[in-house]
From Swiss-Prot:
The keyword Acetylation applies. PANTHER family: KXDL MOTIF-CONTAINING PROTEIN 1. The lineage of its organism: Eukaryota, Metazoa, Chordata, Craniata, Vertebrata. It comes from Bos taurus. As part of the BORC complex may play a role in lysosomes movement and localization at the cell periphery. Associated with the cytosolic face of lysosomes, the BORC complex may recruit ARL8B and couple lysosomes to microtubule plus-end-directed kinesin motor. May also be involved in the biogenesis of lysosome-related organelles such as melanosomes. InterPro entries: KXD1-like, KxDL_dom. The modification N-acetylmethionine is found at M1. This is KxDL motif-containing protein 1.
Length: 176
C-alpha cells in the first residue's frame, strides 16, 4: 500500500484540482443535448428513408406500367405500319399508273431500316427485364423517313399548292 503522500496520489489530486466541476457538468449537459438531437435526426432520417422507399416502389410500379403501355403501343404501331405497307403494295399492284413515279424500292420498303435509335431500343429492353422481352423489330417506318413520301416541309403553311408546286414557283402552272 502506498502512504497517503505517495507520488501517484499527489499527481491525481493535482489533476482533479485543475478540472472545474461546473465545466464537466456543462460538457455532460452539452453531450446529452447533442445526443438528443442526433437521436431525433436519426429518427427523422429513418422516417424519410421509409417514405422514400414507399414512393420509389410506387413510382417503379407506375414506370413499369407506362413502359408496358409504350411497348404495347409500339407493337400496335408496328402492326399498323405492316398493314399500311400491305395496302400500299396491293394498291401499287392494282393501280400501277398511280405509282409509276415512285421507285419500286420505296413501295417494298426495306425491312432492315430502323428509325428507332439503338439507345432507345436498349432503354426499352432494359426497362422490361423483369416483365419479359420486348419486340424491337425494325419494321416501324416513319413516313418522313420513307423514300416514297414527298417532303413537304419546305412549303409555307397557308400557301395553296397544286401537285406539290405552289403558285409562287418561278415556272408558270399549266392552264394559267
Amino acid at each position: 500500500m502506498d502512504p497517503p503522500d505517495s507520488a501517484s496520489r499527489v499527481f491525481s489530486s493535482r489533476i482533479l484540482s485543475m478540472v472545474n466541476a461546473d465545466d464537466v457538468s456543462a460538457i455532460i449537459l452539452a453531450q446529452k443535448n447533442m445526443l438528443d438531437r442526433f437521436e431525433k435526426t436519426n429518427e427523422m432520417l429513418l422516417n424519410f428513408n421509409n417514405l422514400s422507399s414507399a414512393r420509389l416502389q410506387q413510382m417503379n410500379e407506375r414506370f413499369l406500367h407506362h413502359t408496358r403501355t409504350l411497348v404495347e403501343m409500339k407493337r400496335d404501331l408496328d402492326s399498323i405500319f405492316r398493314r399500311i405497307r400491305t395496302l400500299k403494295g396491293k394498291l401499287a399492284r392494282q393501280h400501277p399508273e398511280a405509282f409509276s413515279h415512285i421507285p419500286e424500292a420505296s413501295l417494298l420498303e426495306d425491312e432492315d431500316e430502323d428509325p428507332i435509335p439503338p439507345s432507345t431500343t436498349t432503354t426499352i429492353a432494359t426497362s422490361e427485364q423483369s416483365t419479359g422481352s420486348c419486340d424491337t423489330s425494325p419494321d416501324t417506318v416513319s413516313p418522313s423517313l420513307s423514300p416514297g413520301f414527298e417532303d413537304l416541309s419546305h412549303i409555307r403553311p397557308g400557301s395553296p399548292a397544286i401537285n406539290g408546286r405552289s403558285h409562287t414557283d418561278d415556272e408558270e402552272m399549266p392552264g394559267e
